[in-house]
């Protein structure tokens, strides 16, 4: 075969054959030979995107950690706090569907940058009430004529006002700063000329293969919004007609209902169940649980890459992590603490149990002349280990400051159920729970860390399953619908109905200055535990059954198609090998040594 023939064959092989009536398409990925901008690298994009997620996690995490502070600051019940927390997701609903659909065909980095700017402005608006509202007025003790000291709120204001405003400002600055790199990124990142086509990844783990020529922007044509909008409803119909995608969407929605409700009220649960302060509860969650979740997500990604897990394997890993995680979660029912001893609410003034709560239960024969308020909540811990609603119902006559603590003396009600020392004094604040509660709290943290790691281990396999069950050109749109469904059906309602049910366990309500009901001051620990954990387990159980259905449909619909594809591919390979052998034999027969008499003389 002469040189010109070889060149023609090579030229024919390199030339793509286009169907009749179909425009030629140009790949979005620029070649490595073309001059790329300084920021047009994958590492720059990943770094910028990681910074964006850091800013987003900082904003959402801070909002979750201030749930109890918002409840006390504005004196509102948990159900209304859930509405405020759920409204954080409402802003995404206005644009997420259209951005996910049209954004896949436009300049994605600039769209992300614009979103970061809007997020920065939003966090700045969250900080505005800190500068325009009046300072919080704490409930203070109104002393009688023979008292020597009143409780001053000055120290509390100086320690609680500053971090709120500083954190709100920091969130806004970080979100605005995160938008800068995306304005300098190109529309598409460069791709190497030779891209390995791994048989294991394309045949073992994918059942819908990427074909970039099917959905790239036509060369020389400007994309019009109306032309893209025509395929919106057909694309939406295709997504909801995909059984694996639809079932996985239902599974994730139910599972995120349990996760959103659990995470939103976890600091409150630690405060009420184990008697920890709000700052300590949030610090422990950030120090232990968040690294466990990050490690679980990273481990899931490493496992998917190292072992080259197939789609069915990813579904099994997702199901296994959910089952094992919720089995561990069941053990938390046994790791609870009993109610604190509060006079008139959980115990009588004599220290006996049980007690039936009613409005007059807060008063006793030891404090008939004190004229105490029924609505005030200013807990005081007596020397007898019983917490009193305030120093007034405890019958305290005098008070004195000892450092940062305020000590009350001559408390007649404390003396009734006094300890062996016979001391009738008390100190501001609630009494610590029994001696076994700190140990229970330690066990709770250990189980919580393991559960967080186990549940997050299935995050990446589930995400890979979501991407591989749909057409490549609909990935962005499918992710947008997925995110929209999670936010509408889980992010918004879950904190609300969790808060409504948690409010049913309240024993002592606070009241606003106008007389209306405010936030809950004291919860029934046992009822709170069963509502909080029980609702989470019920939702988790439903998601497990839906995950089993996803795995069943996946095996039924796609594994059989995958086997048929492999069978056809093997037949094609055998046929191609046979043709190559015949062609090789023909080439050998055309050599001069087989036809010595017919050798051409040049």
Swiss-Prot record:
<feature type="topological domain" description="Cytoplasmic">
    <location>
        <begin position="1"/>
        <end position="43"/>
    </location>
</feature>
<feature type="transmembrane region" description="Helical">
    <location>
        <begin position="477"/>
        <end position="502"/>
    </location>
</feature>
<dbReference type="Pfam" id="PF03137">
    <property type="entry name" value="OATP"/>
</dbReference>
<keyword id="KW-0406">Ion transport</keyword>
<feature type="topological domain" description="Cytoplasmic">
    <location>
        <begin position="157"/>
        <end position="238"/>
    </location>
</feature>
<feature type="topological domain" description="Cytoplasmic">
    <location>
        <begin position="468"/>
        <end position="476"/>
    </location>
</feature>
<feature type="compositionally biased region" description="Basic and acidic residues">
    <location>
        <begin position="193"/>
        <end position="214"/>
    </location>
</feature>
<feature type="glycosylation site" description="N-linked (GlcNAc...) asparagine">
    <location>
        <position position="410"/>
    </location>
</feature>
<feature type="transmembrane region" description="Helical">
    <location>
        <begin position="110"/>
        <end position="134"/>
    </location>
</feature>
<feature type="region of interest" description="Disordered">
    <location>
        <begin position="190"/>
        <end position="216"/>
    </location>
</feature>
<feature type="topological domain" description="Extracellular">
    <location>
        <begin position="64"/>
        <end position="82"/>
    </location>
</feature>
<feature type="transmembrane region" description="Helical">
    <location>
        <begin position="44"/>
        <end position="63"/>
    </location>
</feature>
<feature type="topological domain" description="Cytoplasmic">
    <location>
        <begin position="555"/>
        <end position="602"/>
    </location>
</feature>
<feature type="topological domain" description="Extracellular">
    <location>
        <begin position="333"/>
        <end position="444"/>
    </location>
</feature>
<keyword id="KW-1003">Cell membrane</keyword>
<dbReference type="GO" id="GO:0043252">
    <property type="term" value="P:sodium-independent organic anion transport"/>
</dbReference>
<feature type="topological domain" description="Extracellular">
    <location>
        <begin position="503"/>
        <end position="536"/>
    </location>
</feature>
<feature type="glycosylation site" description="N-linked (GlcNAc...) asparagine">
    <location>
        <position position="423"/>
    </location>
</feature>
<dbReference type="GO" id="GO:0008514">
    <property type="term" value="F:organic anion transmembrane transporter activity"/>
</dbReference>
<dbReference type="InterPro" id="IPR002350">
    <property type="entry name" value="Kazal_dom"/>
</dbReference>
<keyword id="KW-0325">Glycoprotein</keyword>
<comment type="similarity">
    <text>Belongs to the organo anion transporter (TC 2.A.60) family.</text>
</comment>
<feature type="transmembrane region" description="Helical">
    <location>
        <begin position="140"/>
        <end position="156"/>
    </location>
</feature>
<keyword id="KW-0812">Transmembrane</keyword>
<feature type="disulfide bond">
    <location>
        <begin position="366"/>
        <end position="396"/>
    </location>
</feature>
<keyword id="KW-0813">Transport</keyword>
<comment type="function">
    <text>Mediates the Na(+)-independent high affinity transport of organic anions such as the thyroid hormones L-thyroxine (T4), L-thyroxine sulfate (T4S), and 3,3',5'-triiodo-L-thyronine (reverse T3, rT3) at the plasma membrane. Regulates T4 levels in different brain regions by transporting T4, and also by serving as an export pump for T4S, which is a source of T4 after hydrolysis by local sulfatases. Increases the access of these substrates to the intracellular sites where they are metabolized by the deiodinases.</text>
</comment>
<keyword id="KW-1015">Disulfide bond</keyword>
<feature type="transmembrane region" description="Helical">
    <location>
        <begin position="83"/>
        <end position="103"/>
    </location>
</feature>
<feature type="domain" description="Kazal-like">
    <location>
        <begin position="360"/>
        <end position="415"/>
    </location>
</feature>
<dbReference type="InterPro" id="IPR036058">
    <property type="entry name" value="Kazal_dom_sf"/>
</dbReference>
<feature type="transmembrane region" description="Helical">
    <location>
        <begin position="239"/>
        <end position="260"/>
    </location>
</feature>
<feature type="disulfide bond">
    <location>
        <begin position="372"/>
        <end position="392"/>
    </location>
</feature>
<dbReference type="Pfam" id="PF07648">
    <property type="entry name" value="Kazal_2"/>
</dbReference>
<feature type="transmembrane region" description="Helical">
    <location>
        <begin position="537"/>
        <end position="554"/>
    </location>
</feature>
<feature type="topological domain" description="Extracellular">
    <location>
        <begin position="135"/>
        <end position="139"/>
    </location>
</feature>
<keyword id="KW-0445">Lipid transport</keyword>
<feature type="topological domain" description="Cytoplasmic">
    <location>
        <begin position="305"/>
        <end position="308"/>
    </location>
</feature>
<dbReference type="GO" id="GO:0015125">
    <property type="term" value="F:bile acid transmembrane transporter activity"/>
</dbReference>
<feature type="glycosylation site" description="N-linked (GlcNAc...) asparagine">
    <location>
        <position position="400"/>
    </location>
</feature>
<protein>
    <recommendedName>
        <fullName>Solute carrier organic anion transporter family member 1C1</fullName>
    </recommendedName>
</protein>
<feature type="topological domain" description="Cytoplasmic">
    <location>
        <begin position="104"/>
        <end position="109"/>
    </location>
</feature>
